[in-house]
């Protein structure tokens, strides 16, 4: 479900799949062919979240931000089940494993 937050609304334009139980909130930009799976929350209430094309955020994940600390997920990234990404940057063609926790200002490079 998409939710506006204040004056920001999600841009889910060409996403491949958003599960009915996923919540996309605020200033979120989903790239082409991106998927967000069941019971995942992507909440951009304090800063922007950008998820690149071809990426997938699997079941039960949380993607969030802090004030002035956006979350940026590159192209062709897989985020495994139950992961938490908070105010971090993940480079292109990367895999974030199941249950991983990435907190503010963490940077994961390309091809990781």
Model regions and ranges:
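Extreme N-terminal tail/first-helix region
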Residues: 1-16
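Residue-level preference for alpha-helix termini and adjacent loops
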Residues: 2-4, 24, 48
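Left-handed beta-helix
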Residues: 14, 19-20, 25-26, 31-32, ...
């Amino acid at each position: 479900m998409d939710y506006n937050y204040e004056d920001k609304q999600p841009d889910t334009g060409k996403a491949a799949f958003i599960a009915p139980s996923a919540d996309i909130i605020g200033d979120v930009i989903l790239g082409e062919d991106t998927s967000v799976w069941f019971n995942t929350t992507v909440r951009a209430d304090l800063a922007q979240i950008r998820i690149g094309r071809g990426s997938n955020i699997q079941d039960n994940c949380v993607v969030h931000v802090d004030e002035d600390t956006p979350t940026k997920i590159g192209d062709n990234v897989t985020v495994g089940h139950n992961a938490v990404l908070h105010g971090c940057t993940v480079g292109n063609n990367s895999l974030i494993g199941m249950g991983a926790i990435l907190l503010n200002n963490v940077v994961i490079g390309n091809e990781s």
